[in-house]
Regions:
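N-terminal processing/targeting junctions
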Residues: 113, 157, 169, 191-195
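Long, low-complexity, intrinsically disordered segments
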Residues: 174-195
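N-terminal intrinsically disordered, cationic/polar leader segments
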Residues: 1-90, 95-152, 182, 186
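Intrinsically disordered, low-complexity terminal tails and inter-domain linkers enriched
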Residues: 150-179
C-alpha cells in the first residue's frame, strides 16, 4: 500500500441539467477550473449511459464487461481526480437503479442526464500522485510520489501498538482500520433497536 497526504482545497457544487452528458460536463469543468487532484460525489438520474460492471473473466489484464442502460435510472456515486498524461483524469464508480434493477460499476464514455445530476467536487492540494498506465494490469493506476514528493508506506499493519501511535487511538471492539468517528457511528447504528 502507498499513500499521499495533502490538504483540502476549493469546494464546488454543480448542477448538470437534462440532456447534458454528465461525464463530459464534469471533465470540462475540472479542466476549466484547473483541478489537478480531488474527489467528486454525485446523485441524480441518467437517461442513458455505458458502464463497466466488472471483467468478462477475472484475469489480468481484464477484458471489460460493458453494459448499456437507458430509460431513466437513478444514480449515485463518486470519483477521483488525478493528473494524467493529457490533464486531469476523472475515474467514476456509480450505482444506477430502475424498477427493481440495479447496476454498479465504472461509468465510461457517456452518461446523459435525465432531469438533473447534482455533484460536489472537492479539490485536494499538496498530493504527490498521478494516474499512469500500468502494463501489468492493463489499467490506469494512481501512482504516489510522482508529483515532486515521495510515496509513504503504510505503517503498523495489524500491530496494535503502532496503530495507536499512527492514529492516536486504540481499536475498540474490532473496528479494524475504520477511523474513530466512523467506527463510533457504525457501533451506535448497530446497537440501536430497529424502529
Amino acid at each position: 500500500m502507498q499513500y499521499s497526504e495533502g490538504q483540502l482545497g476549493r469546494v464546488f457544487v454543480l448542477r448538470i441539467d437534462e440532456g447534458e452528458d454528465f461525464l463530459a460536463a464534469l471533465q470540462e469543468f475540472v479542466r476549466k477550473k484547473e483541478i489537478r487532484t480531488g474527489s467528486v460525489f454525485f446523485l441524480g438520474a441518467l437517461r442513458e449511459g455505458r458502464m463497466v460492471t466488472g471483467p468478462e473473466k477475472p484475469i489480468i489484464p481484464p477484458e471489460p464487461h460493458f453494459v448499456f442502460f437507458e430509460g431513466g435510472w437513478e444514480v449515485f456515486g463518486m470519483g477521483t481526480i488525478f493528473p494524467g498524461d493529457e490533464g486531469p483524469m476523472v475515474h467514476y464508480h456509480a450505482s444506477v437503479g430502475r424498477a427493481g434493477h440495479a447496476l454498479t460499476g465504472c461509468l465510461r464514455e457517456r452518461a446523459v442526464t435525465y432531469l438533473l445530476v447534482e455533484a460536489v467536487v472537492i479539490e485536494f492540494t499538496g498530493l504527490a500522485i498521478r494516474r499512469e498506465f500500468d502494463e501489468k494490469t492493463g489499467v490506469h493506476l494512481p501512482v504516489h510520489g510522482t508529483e515532486g514528493g515521495t510515496p509513504e508506506k503504510a505503517k503498523g499493519t495489524g500491530d496494535e501498538s503502532s496503530r495507536k501511535e499512527t492514529t492516536g487511538r486504540e481499536d475498540k471492539e474490532g473496528d479494524g482500520d475504520l477511523s474513530g468517528g466512523l467506527a463510533a457511528i457504525i457501533r451506535d447504528l448497530t446497537r440501536r433497536p430497529a424502529s
